[in-house]
A protein has these predicted regions:
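N-terminal helix-turn-helix
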Residues: 35-68
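Extreme N-terminal segment that seeds HTH/winged-HTH DNA-binding domains in transcriptional regulators
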Residues: 1-36, 41, 47, 85-90
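HTH-adjacent hinge/linker in prokaryotic transcriptional regulators
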Residues: 58, 62-90
Length: 90
């Protein structure tokens, strides 16, 4: 997944991230069921606040483009995974 933020954009960071992920899902660059990086990992990669990524993911989830799965890691700690929605064969 490739996300590029534009410093001169009038759109907030979360909107830029949401729009780019949405575009990649719709043009099939991101495949159905493909895992997305955690909000923390993507925020670190883009050097932005994790809340910006969480908001973008929340909005994508509300649009039905991604799904959120909760589970536990191998140590039993809670873990949340985000994936491109399976039903997203548009």
């Amino acid at each position: 997944m490739n996300i590029e933020l534009k410093d001169l954009s009038h759109n907030p960071v979360y909107a830029q991230v949401r729009e780019q992920i949405e575009s990649q899902i719709k043009n099939k660059t991101l495949a159905s069921g493909e895992p997305l990086p955690s909000p923390a990992a993507l925020a670190q990669k883009l050097s932005v606040d994790k809340g910006e990524i969480q908001r973008a993911y929340f909005e994508l989830e509300q649009l039905g483009l991604i799904t959120k799965h909760t589970g536990k890691d191998f140590l039993g700690k809670p873990r949340i995974d985000y994936r491109v929605a399976i039903s997203n064969a548009r």
